Amino acid sequence: MIWMMLLAVQTVPANYDAVAVAPGSHHILMEDERVRVLRVEIAPGATEPVHDHRWPSIMYFEQPQPITYVVYKLVDGKPVETRRIDAPPINVGQTVRAEPEGLHAVSNRGSAPFVAVRVEFKDGRAVGAGGPTP
């Protein structure tokens, strides 16, 4: 998906980890040395804090809603918005692979909570139906 590829090009400092800076929307379901499984929940009308995802992942959309990705870059050590991308419609049960994502936030434009499960692969390889992806 193009909007996810646009987010993958940035390098950011460690203090923007999704769980650390956006704990209200990123809940750890399981974590070990190889994977981290997150439940992502964003209330209707809410925008989560600016954060990143350092590892490739697979996302399963449990309760998709219309969302806007807000992309940021660091300027003098502070995040500055660079663009907004209205994501294409997402279907219930849709699953996508994602590369590591740079600084961004997600706004839920829908009338119900946005809910997804993200499996992050700490070894840098997302596994899917076609096997490992380096």
Predicted regions and their residues:
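Sec-dependent N-terminal signal peptides
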Residues: 2-10
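Short N-terminal segments immediately surrounding and downstream of signal-peptide cleavage
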Residues: 11-33, 132-134
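Mature N-terminal segment immediately following signal peptide/propeptide cleavage
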Residues: 23-51
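Short acidic-glycine-tyrosine-enriched beta hairpin
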Residues: 30-34, 73-101
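Histidine-centered active-site/metal-ligand motif
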Residues: 51-53, 104
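Glycine- and acidic-residue-biased ligand/ion/polar-headgroup-sensing regions
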Residues: 54-78
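Asparagine-centered strand-capping/turn motif at beta-strand->loop junctions
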Residues: 106-110
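Extracytoplasmic/periplasmic copper-protein system
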Residues: 123-134
